[in-house]
Amino acid sequence: MSRKYFGTDGIRGRVGEFPITPDFVLKLGWAVGMAFRRQGNCRVLIGKDTRSSGYMFESAFEAGLSASGADTLLLGPMPTPGIAYLTRTFHAEAGVVISASHNPHDDNGIKFFSGQGTKLPDDVELMIEELLDAPMTVVESARLGKVSRINDAAGRYIEFCKSSVPTSTDFNGLKVVLDCANGATYKIAPSVFRELGAEVTVLAASPNGLNINDKCGSTHLDGLQAAVVEHHADLGIAFDGDGDRVMMVDHTGAVVDGDELLFLIARDLQESGRLQGGVVGTLMSNLGLELALQELHIPFVRAKVGDRYVMAELLARNWMLGGENSGHIVCCQNTTTGDAIIAALQVLMALKHRGQTLAEARQGIRKCPQVLINVRFKGESDPLEHPSVKEASVRVTEQMGGRGRVLLRKSGTEPLVRVMVEGDEEASVRAHAEQLAKIVSEVCA
């Protein structure tokens, strides 16, 4: 059954435009409360990133929960994986994240965790959608939900992050630059790395409600690259606005993406005898990752794009490590969702075990040239179903003669078609990608 409101990761859009409006979010809070109250008493955690609109939507969602009779625990600004962790430790029925991740401040969204800190099952999302289309009722006054604030939420999550590495860990002598994207990690990440002994320089840690992801964070690495070189740092770490994506920069200023970080963690786990099963990537994972893992005899499978699908594949196979090239990395031995801070700590441990710099360690993987072009579209029609697009995709695949991949897919969070071509020669890969993107653009027009 198709979803009316939920995308691949909750509900997201432009602030003030349906469904990201206060009245809809209030009804959404009520629907969530009603769905979980069917199982008995209900407590729901709410956390958010640093967008100014987050306060408005927090109040609206909280009001809806109260109307349903569900209690609310407010965390304040908190990385998405921190909300997943605290939902588990507080034994709440659900966790709510008010965030649009790596998007600009004028977008926002709502995503959810189950009481186990995992994405909501499909049947629960469908139940919430049914309730959204039902008349809203309010419980009697004596049964209205109560609201309380968790004042030590940040400290709890900091200690959890530190517990993901051995207690003897000491990063003394390591110079690190952190880019916090003016987002949810702005206080927590510097504390974690400093308390573990690293010398930390911090960028983009002064949120004002409007500057989240603004020319900073994991999707805008120029500032971090320059700062790493300027400060003679060993490496740089960039988070996105809600702290579930991580990208890194080596001491030369070269970018190290999610595929490379995933490889470094997998190799370290294998070398220390801690790797369980194989690695889950996605349709967008670079072919070079697959080949590098193959050389180490580490199994590799591809899930659909989106960390919920990576997590589902990990659970189905009872494996422990997966991720996306965008920097969503799931380490199941520590977390139930992508956690940027914990993933970064695992990479630092891998470097420490090998006695290598990030620049040296990344030589174990040779990425294949990959070109990704985003094409914006309007309307309800699916450009990928157009005969011209299908024919062009088949033609380009045949022209590559089995030495590359073509992937066309719609974004689950934005009105975009992603055109990805991968092969062994960059000029031809770019030419093929531009050719396909041109055809998709013409169809979308």
From Swiss-Prot:
Gene Ontology CC annotations of this record: cytosol
Q: Which InterPro entries match?
A: A-D-PHexomutase_a/b/a-I (IPR005844), A-D-PHexomutase_a/b/a-I/II/III (IPR016055), A-D-PHexomutase_a/b/a-II (IPR005845), A-D-PHexomutase_a/b/a-III (IPR005846), A-D-PHexomutase_C (IPR005843), A-D-PHexomutase_C_sf (IPR036900), A-D-PHexomutase_CS (IPR016066), Alpha-D-phosphohexomutase_SF (IPR005841)
The residue range of the signal peptide is none
Recorded catalytic reaction(s): these are: alpha-D-glucosamine 1-phosphate = D-glucosamine 6-phosphate
The EC number(s) given in the record are 5.4.2.10
Cofactor note as given: Binds 1 Mg(2+) ion per subunit.
Q: What does this protein do?
A: Catalyzes the conversion of glucosamine-6-phosphate to glucosamine-1-phosphate.
Please state what the protein is called.
Answer: Phosphoglucosamine mutase
Q: Which organism is it from?
A: Pseudomonas aeruginosa (strain LESB58)
Instruction: Please spell out the taxonomic lineage of the organism that makes this protein.
Output: Bacteria, Pseudomonadati, Pseudomonadota, Gammaproteobacteria, Pseudomonadales
- This protein's gene is called glmM
